[in-house]
Amino acid sequence: MSTALATLAGKLAERVGMDSVDPLELITTLRQTAFKGDASDAQFIALLIVANQYGLNPWTKEIYAFPDKQNGIVPVVGVDGWSRIINENQQFDGMDFEQDNESCTCRIYRKDRNHPICVTEWMDECRREPFKTREGREITGPWQSHPKRMLRHKAMIQCARLAFGFAGIYDKDEAERIVENTAYTAERQP
């Protein structure tokens, strides 16, 4: 284990009140929970840097990692993690949503601004198709079971990026698209 990895893990453990736990045990547990598959020390360090930067807890899945195709990682922040970093921002002054079957608009209010930051996300641009197994079987995901909730999450995350300048972190859907390296083109609506 590298010194940088031990230092970052210790800093994170201290922040979440786990500094009395053996650092090696913490790192072992994190390797098993915050990564899909094996992780190198470099990938692990990258995740811990982002977790510490945004004050996110990888033990509670506020942040975890998807390995990319170039042996790096894509830092994935869960909805609870996004909610934490939004609510902990000192300038945050509330948010609201307007939603119908086609779109969701999120407004985030900042204490230091006169006007809210508004973002609209569209169902036809964000929705994902069911996953297909190698055998061709369809597996439905959250976009099929809870499409409006997923769209609301997308609108909140994109609005938070504009309102607070969050960069280098992604939601699970974005991470999957990055790793798949696929672009999605929405169908034109009449």
Where are these regions (language model features)?
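Glycine-rich anion-binding surface patch
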Residues: M1-P190
